[in-house]
Amino acid sequence: MAALAAGVSKQRAVAEGLGSNQNAVKYLGQDFETLRKQCLNSGVLFKDPEFPACPSALGYKDLGPGSPDTQGIVWKRPTELCPNPQFIVGGATRTDIRQGGLGDCWLLAAIASLTLNEKLLYRVLPRDQSFQKDYAGIFHFQFWQYGEWVEVVIDDRLPTKNGQLLFLHSEEGNEFWSALLEKAYAKLNGSYEALVGGSTIEGFEDFTGGISEFYDLKKPPENLYYIIQKALRKGSLLGCSIDVSTAAEAEATTRQKLVKGHAYSVTGVEEVNFHGRPEKLIRLRNPWGEVEWSGAWSDNAPEWNYIDPRRKEELDKKAEDGEFWMSFSDFLKQYSRLEICNLSPDSLSSEEIHKWNLVLFNGRWTRGSTAGGCLNYPGTYWTNPQFKIHLDEVDEDQEEGTSEPCCTVLLGLMQKNRRRQKRIGQGMLSIGYAVYQIPKELESHTDAHLGRDFFLGRQPSTCSSTYMNLREVSSRVRLPPGQYLVVPSTFEPFKDGDFCLRVFSEKKAKALEIGDTVSGHPHEPHPRDMDEEDEHVRSLFEEFVGKDSEISANQLKRVLNEVLSKRTDMKFDGFNINTCREMISLLDSDGTGSLGPMEFKTLWLKIRTYLEIFQEMDHNHVGTIEAHEMRTALKKAGFTLNNQVQQTIAMRYACSKLGVDFNGFVACMIRLETLFKLFRLLDKDQNGIVQLSLAEWLCCVLV
């Protein structure tokens, strides 16, 4: 209950702007300015109670309490390590990033790339902090997390051994921004050890809020040059590297002066006329050193003598120190991989940049309601969350060689918080997605999930290449204009997890979650609908309480269970007293806490309707229906509910084996009827909003 209320409160705050870089979420409720002011007023340096300087902050296994690797560690503030500590010395540069005894080189590479873009760097590293002015032992950083910016506050106590920083540190002995940044990121993820192993892309995204693509340059798409050209035009961050197969190859230099294992930045592409034919060139930068490419189109290569001198001068002006040109064909031969981090619109301020349009959805896979697994599981696949994208504007500049107008879309599916959950043994799930074109006759269908029949025999228009246990799977797709259904899923069904689905499009795309409608129109029976069996039930009622008397919850339980226990077409252990109280709550119009004869008749007819639905859904006649089938059962009973409500129902009414028995099924239906009835009575303006005082609210939920 508390988690649900917190979720609703969070959604409302986000709608009002919480989570932007200018209004970041306060991680764990800690506010930097408030805490710093308290410390300055009291004259005491900040000690972070949420991430204390103790073994639990280091890790849980290899760096856990009692591990030999953690013996002799002392937490010290920079003021205890050197006489004149500085936050930043001469600007943040790649030389400030030196790896320590933690396997987080993926994070360090991302930080190094971030130093090349000052605007993006200072979104992560607020400037309002130092070891001189208003120093109170407290620092703060901002990271993008699953659709929102989060401000993380830390104290400046850092793990040391023999007077030296244990983990990330700067070449400058008195500079500490990089070590403090690593600590803040460790806090966000639960511990330093949680940072071991990862992808540079993960760091890129958490520092920028962008969406990343990866290309294997041994198998490049035909239009890769065009993709790079457009990415640069949109202000994206591009990095490339040469794979190393052994540790000995790291830092090795190729015959033509390229360094293996280093991350190079891609900074430009141009086309020149060379010997009467077009030659594609690409400009790179090595932020790690002075070594530069010595092959064709390098600084003093002879190829430059065979192009227009004015064009040569123009390209010379575009290349800064540390940058060099090479042919695109050589680029594909020499490098192994290319990573593109496409920035979200709020990361880009220049009006000249062609920005992406972004739509973001947060969702959840819940066992028994929305965790349907992949297409290998057709019985549950359709229960996964479903999202509709409407693409009606084609790209302005279509690719060469394409005849049909298309819409370019970047899809990214990211699972949430798995790194933080490593300490409890929850690793990455295998995730992926499929995209289906919606036929014309279903384009207006938005109020409920597309069912099992829609997916049977239907092939996706495109899908993620494979299910992978990565934090994010993403791909660039080109689709004809139309409406599309995106289905994100885990590989196996019944796997709980939170996710974030992002859609970056060249042109503005309309998008919505399918089945976000909530409505309830349950069948209202009439006592004249009673048949022979119903007359028997009525006579039993009169036998228990008399013709004109009212029946209590305990008596109701005895009557209903006696009738239903005689049925041979179902397995049923009986209604419990709480379900019977729910029944009385729904139909007790005069507030006596009991049911009269007419109210009892109405109740029995409702139960009979629910029994018909239950037996239809109990395919194996075992006395339970599978929790994921509740969506269909609820629809048959007149309820259309969104994923959030479906997930709540699964948590409330399904047993550990994800089955719902008849008692739970009826309790759910009766409860829903009661809640819809209450809301309609209170929604006087019929605008879908009810305002209640605290006392009124308590009376309603306690009914």
From Swiss-Prot:
Residues 355-512 are annotated as: Domain III. Calcium-regulated non-lysosomal thiol-protease. Involved in membrane trafficking in the gastric surface mucus cells (pit cells) and may involve the membrane trafficking of mucus cells via interactions with coat protein. Proteolytically cleaves the beta-subunit of coatomer complex. The active site is at residues 105, 262, 286. It is an enzyme of class 3 (hydrolase). Monomer and homooligomer. Interacts with COPS1/GPS1, COPB1, EYA2, NME2, NME4 and TOMM70. One of its GO terms (biological process) is calcium-dependent self proteolysis. SMART domains: calpain_III (SM00720), CysPc (SM00230), EFh (SM00054). This is Calpain-8. Its EC number is 3.4.22.53. Residues 513-531 are annotated as: Linker. The domain III mediates oligomerization. Undergoes autolytic cleavage between Ala-5 and Ala-6 which gives rise to fragments extending from Ala-6 to the C-terminus, Ala-6 to the EF-hand 2 domain and from Ala-6 to the beginning of domain III. Ca(2+) 1 binds at residues 588, 590, 592, 594, 599. Pfam families: Calpain_III, Peptidase_C2. CDD domains: Calpain_III, CysPc. SUPFAM superfamilies: Calpain large subunit, middle domain (domain III), Cysteine proteinases, EF-hand. Ca(2+) 2 binds at residues 618, 620, 624, 629. It catalyses: Broad endopeptidase specificity. InterPro entries: C2_III, Calpain_cysteine_protease, Calpain_domain_III, Calpain_III, Calpain_III_sf, EF-hand-dom_pair, EF_hand_dom, Papain-like_cys_pep_sf. GO terms for molecular function: calcium ion binding; calcium-dependent cysteine-type endopeptidase activity; identical protein binding. Belongs to the peptidase C2 family.
